Amino acid sequence: MPDPTPGEVIWVVRDPVVGREQSGRRPAVVVSSRAHISLADTLVMVVPVTSVDRGWSNHVLLRGDVFDRDSWAMTEQVRTLSRKRVVGHAGQVDAGTLADIRRWIQDFLDE
């Protein structure tokens, strides 16, 4: 599989997990920068995707070339994965969606 790109929606195998993390084969949005993808050539940073609307303001609706049904990026669950967990391509979010996702991640990191 080619290198992931920022905003790409990929299929990942997330087992084993702990607590409230999603398990199994799931879609995730790549949030790594191009520089991180280039430097950390065996890793990728992602946020998982859900089709359940919980009404949480930090869950970002995916816009772009993605799924036939509404889906949301779960920005509170940023995870760095081995690229060996990537098992396929699912689509691409638009630039505005990726910016919204990254803004939420930055908000979680700011003091």
Cite the ranges covered by each PLM segment:
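Conserved functional hotspots at enzyme active or ligand-binding sites that engage polyanionic ligands
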Residues: M1-E111
